[in-house]
Regions:
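Hinge/cleft segment of the Venus flytrap/periplasmic-binding protein
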Residues: 2, 142, 161-162, 256-299
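Immediate post-signal peptide segment of exported/extracytoplasmic ligand-binding proteins
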Residues: 1-6, 29, 133-136
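Hydrophobic alpha-helical segments within soluble ligand-binding/sensing domains
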Residues: 47, 112-139, 180, 237-243, ...
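Hydrophobic alpha-helical
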Residues: 62, 68-88, 169, 173-244
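Short, solvent-exposed amphipathic alpha-helices that sit
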Residues: 16-31, 121-125, 149-167, 179, ...
């Protein structure tokens, strides 16, 4: 079979996406693929333009497949339709969109999704909050951009699973530690922040949790520093990123997620080899670290 050419479009280069990019390249090398990774700097217009340029290139220059994690929850429907019409396979990674089933009616190319269960990840974080705050309290949530599918789904899951006697305040950030540090620092300067009332901080990734923690610990007040050192911080990420933070007591607990890229690439290659559509949607695993039962003993 001719060497497959695959382009991977990632929204940014945060810790999770960096790992996705590394896995794309190493898996591509192992399987003998022509693999290219591009990034959109969290800009949906940039991502759309990058992909359309590839789709509209000459037939000789076009890839066999695009593996895409959309920047926003809208999910690049028109771009996906253009790709499939041009005979390019379309794979959604780490997100869910509402048009995959429709596109799969065209048997020309593989179309499928490999994703984290973002809603379930949020539910796990909500259960961690419940384990740590059985009497209720106030939680500072440091979350990704409003238009991000990941941010929306994780928030909804967390909100459903957390106890009703837990109140949340949300800070918005880009998907980086530095952005979370800046957002939290700016919020602390507001007269209405009332930082002292919060009994837990939950980040939608471990980077957001760590960035917020650094900002909160930068206070000049010894009493406030002591408070934040004793406050539970929660994060989300792959095992190699979050377990050392929990073991090092930077985070109290984390939701451990999995990368999607390896499964997406291997599934795609098999689809080309067998000329058959893969399952429409595959979900990778997530779990609490430590286990929820053990976490309840930490309160």
């Amino acid at each position: 079979m001719k060497k497959l050419r695959i382009v991977v479009s990632l929204p940014n280069d945060n810790a999770y996406q960096h790992e996705q990019g590394v896995i794309a390249k190493t898996t591509g090398e192992r399987l003998g693929l022509d693999m290219q990774v591009i990034r959109a700097d969290d800009d949906s217009i940039t991502q759309s333009q990058q992909l359309l340029k590839i789709i509209q290139s000459s037939a000789e220059a076009r890839p066999n497949a695009l593996i895409v994690e959309p920047v926003t929850a809208t999910g690049l429907r028109r771009v996906a339709e253009a790709a499939v019409a041009a005979g390019i396979a379309w794979v959604i990674s780490n997100s869910d969109v509402d048009y995959v089933q429709q596109l799969r009616k065209s048997p020309r190319v593989p179309v499928f999704t490999v994703t984290q269960g973002q809603h379930e990840i949020g539910r796990l974080q909500g259960k961690q909050i419940a384990a740590l705050l059985p009497q209720g309290g106030a939680v500072l949530c440091v979350e990704g951009p409003t238009m991000s599918f990941v941010a929306v789904q994780r928030h909804e899951g967390m909100d459903i699973a957390k106890p009703r006697n837990v109140q949340t305040t949300t800070l918005r950030s880009k998907w980086s530690e530095e952005s979370a540090f800046q957002s939290t620092g700016a919020w602390l300067k507001l007269a209405t922040s009332r930082a002292e009332k919060f009994s837990l901080v939950a980040g939608q990734t471990h980077e957001l949790a760590v960035g917020a923690r650094k900002a909160l610990l930068s206070t000049e007040s010894p009493e406030q520093q002591k408070k934040w050192l004793e406050t539970p911080f929660l994060g989300i990420g792959i095992a190699s990123q979050v377990k050392p933070l929990v073991n090092g007591r930077i985070l109290t607990a984390a939701v451990v997620t999995s990368v999607t890229m390896d499964i997406a690439i291997r599934t795609l290659v098999k689809a080309f080899e067998t000329q058959a559509q893969p399952p429409e949607r595959t979900v990778v695993e997530a779990s609490s670290f430590p286990d929820l039962d053990k976490l309840a003993t930490k309160r």
